[in-house]
Amino acid sequence: MALNVVILAAGKGTRMRSDLPKVLHPIAHKSMVQHVIDTAHKVGSDAIQLVYGYGADKLKASLGEQQLNWVLQAEQLGTGHAVAQASPHIADNDTVLILYGDVPLIQQSTLEALLAARPENGVAILTVNLANPMGYGRIVRTPCEGQEQGKVIGIIEQKDATAEQLLINEINTGIMAVPGKQLKAWLSRLSNNNAQGEYYLTDIIAMAHADGVAIDTAQPQSAIEVEGANNRVQLAQLERAYQAREAEKLMLAGANLRDPSRIDIRGDVTVGMDVMIDINVIFEGKVTLGNNVTIGAGAILIDCEIADNAEIKPYSIIEGAKLGVAASAGPFARLRPGAELKQDAHIGNFVEVKKAVIGVGSKAGHLAYLGDAIIGDGVNIGAGTITCNYDGANKHLTVIEDNVFVGSDTQLVAPVTIGKGATLGAGSTITRDVGENELVITRVKQKHLTGWQRPVKIKK
């Protein structure tokens, strides 16, 4: 029996006041619908039907490389009508899981519980109890022996509910698991004879009850999982809820967060034990932090690996880089893609490293650019050092071997190699290879001019 997931993503989202389709608005730098697609994959979907309408070009540009079956809903005539567009792609023996592209926080564990709750050849509905159920369809039950809550017999929408039904606080989330054969039959019988003039997907529950099909329910751990976003205020609320959830995961995994409400997690972060994370840190992409790592305030980490006991000092940007054991960067350091700091290496304030390896124990304390370079162990890079790697057309490599001392304000014009133990005098411009243990100074000879008069301002 295959799991066929139908994701409804056809709405425009007028209240977002945006040209972007509603489901493409982001939570943690990922579109809402992408969150839903990712969760569908996690529960083992065999096929995903994406029902789309407004903004097709933008949707396909964002999602088009994925294994999705694109199903057009040319007119938005209700949720039942939307699912019906996917009917030709549903096999009789499929289990159909219906999800929503603007409900991004639904959890894998919740969907697994819903699928487990579905009776054989029956229907499972995800419901939630709300103190204020205004606007939602209510779950209608009838007393049944052996079922404390009673048997589900239907779902009534807010505008069609009686005064008594409006008192019900168990609401329909719209998420359900349905057998394929029966779903297609029920969809063909839907009517739009209701206050909205739409084809309600919820009407299939009354049909299931009338046909004697077993109906069961499951509930999420938190109601926020089934909240949607219809405007930017709600989008921001979901963002905060997502961030709180991800921060909690980090703390449970062994990280200390100085303030869990002031962290942004926009990717997959893996942490070791006793990690310390200060305020206003941003994580993007895939980030791995080893044991006893310290991240300073305001740091941004993107697609990087940080080994045990390493430290990222405040306001540093680490992107596509690796830090070895006990290495450190910052404050105000920038490591660009391809940068690698070996064990105990240090990059200080206002140092930029790009596509360069900094060897064991090597240091560049301040104000340097190290690009397209291989730097050995025990090297000292003075302030103001620049590897001149670009000739206007191509990038060239600088090699600095072990135990080299580079004086301040030195320019290394690549391609160039500095041999082991060499010393480069401050203010030098190095254009040729330097041998082992050589001292090289290329400064202009200092001149002393006596009797010189400093210019003075001309009075107007």
From Swiss-Prot:
Listed EC numbers: 2.7.7.23, 2.3.1.157
GO molecular function: glucosamine-1-phosphate N-acetyltransferase activity; magnesium ion binding; UDP-N-acetylglucosamine diphosphorylase activity
Pfam families named in the record: Hexapep, NTP_transf_3
Subcellular location: Cytoplasm
Pathway: Nucleotide-sugar biosynthesis; UDP-N-acetyl-alpha-D-glucosamine biosynthesis; N-acetyl-alpha-D-glucosamine 1-phosphate from alpha-D-glucosamine 6-phosphate (route II): step 2/2; Nucleotide-sugar biosynthesis; UDP-N-acetyl-alpha-D-glucosamine biosynthesis; UDP-N-acetyl-alpha-D-glucosamine from N-acetyl-alpha-D-glucosamine 1-phosphate: step 1/1; Bacterial outer membrane biogenesis; LPS lipid A biosynthesis
Top EC class for this record: transferase
Main function: Catalyzes the last two sequential reactions in the de novo biosynthetic pathway for UDP-N-acetylglucosamine (UDP-GlcNAc). The C-terminal domain catalyzes the transfer of acetyl group from acetyl coenzyme A to glucosamine-1-phosphate (GlcN-1-P) to produce N-acetylglucosamine-1-phosphate (GlcNAc-1-P), which is converted into UDP-GlcNAc by the transfer of uridine 5-monophosphate (from uridine 5-triphosphate), a reaction catalyzed by the N-terminal domain.
Quaternary structure, from the entry: Homotrimer.
Protein name from the UniProt record: Bifunctional protein GlmU
Species name: Shewanella baltica (strain OS195)
